[in-house]
Amino acid sequence: MSETAKKVIVGMSGGVDSSVSAWLLQQQGYQVEGLFMKNWEEDDGEEYCTAAADLADAQAVCDKLGIELHTVNFAAEYWNNVFELFLAEYKAGRTPNPDILCNKEIKFKAFLEFAAEDLGADYIATGHYVRRADVDGKSRLLRGLDSNKDQSYFLYTLSHEQIAQSLFPVGELEKPQVRKIAEDLGLVTAKKKDSTGICFIGERKFREFLGRYLPAQPGKIITVDGDEIGEHQGLMYHTLGQRKGLGIGGTKEGTEEPWYVVDKDVENNILVVAQGHEHPRLMSVGLIAQQLHWVDREPFTGTMRCTVKTRYRQTDIPCTVKALDDDRIEVIFDEPVAAVTPGQSAVFYNGEVCLGGGIIEQRLPLPV
């Protein structure tokens, strides 16, 4: 069997990126089929309608391209392996990134296994803006060509074996090119806006949604000087560096500068705020990360120079990484960084190559 005759199952979301991915693979000679994943049991009419519309769009694209669309329900896997951990992290006062966990447990585990075992796939494909390259017998994860859309931050948990079984057709393109292809093909997804919100759950009102599963616990908002200036409705609704939604204005003691969350005292249910986006309490000189995943699956020892992102769309930060033990590292930034948030991921790069990353366990504050 030639390489181009191999079977690829494309994860069809009902969006433009997966739609164009399917067409690109057809042009490359692959045998292409689609798979629509249902990963959440809708509990309200609006959400049901959104999921139904996405499935209808995915079906319309597959019909247009002349490919078969399969469907599968991964709701149980999503609940057990993604959502329960997501809730536990919020309950502990941390700010998790469910999209990263969703990619790890659903798109590149449950989907990959289902496609290979049940559908006979040689590869899976997704509409992620990343690239792969084979170096020294291992598949590497590279940033997407479109730096504005690069999604390697969300895929750092993939192993080189998973990357070797995955294709990322739009990773070699820029977003406007993808939309142009969809328009030229007359695909219904050509002008569909990009999805946002929690992975697979959609654009819900986050506060209301989280409140269904975790009871809110109101508490004090205090300044770094210890003055009580307001009440929060639950620490889980707030993250370090947050400015909007605090419900506090200027105070007699403060200036007119906006307030930012600089700390969360989980034990006492207190939200700590300060004025100014570069307040010293908001700055970190480094971090400790755990739950490490390296793409090449080689254990990291010693030290290395590289760059790091502590959140999506952040400019790369030059840093020095030092191994503390098998599953913990210390990262020291060249310059202090604002709003390093426990629970989020620190993802490391060597140029275009994504090396891997880990969960931020703690930030190393600026010495005072």
From Swiss-Prot:
Stretch list, region Interaction with tRNA: 149-151, 311-312
CDD domains: MnmA_TRMU-like (cd01998)
One Gene Ontology molecular-function label: tRNA binding
Catalysed reaction, written as an equation: S-sulfanyl-L-cysteinyl-[protein] + uridine(34) in tRNA + AH2 + ATP = 2-thiouridine(34) in tRNA + L-cysteinyl-[protein] + A + AMP + diphosphate + H(+)
The protein's name: tRNA-specific 2-thiouridylase MnmA
GO biological process: tRNA wobble position uridine thiolation
Protein's cellular compartments: Cytoplasm
Disulfide bond annotation, renumbered to this chain: C102-C199
Keyword Protein biosynthesis: no
Record site feature (Interaction with tRNA), residues: H128, Q344
Residue positions of the active site: C102 (nucleophile), C199 (cysteine persulfide intermediate)
Keywords assigned by UniProt, alphabetized: ATP-binding, Cytoplasm, Disulfide bond, Nucleotide-binding, RNA-binding, Transferase, tRNA processing, tRNA-binding
Protein's gene: mnmA
InterPro entries per UniProt: MnmA-like (IPR004506), MnmA-like_C (IPR046885), MnmA-like_central (IPR046884), MnmA-like_central_sf (IPR023382), Rossmann-like_a/b/a_fold (IPR014729)
Family that this chain belongs to: Belongs to the MnmA/TRMU family.
Region described as Interaction with target base in tRNA: spans on this chain: 97-99
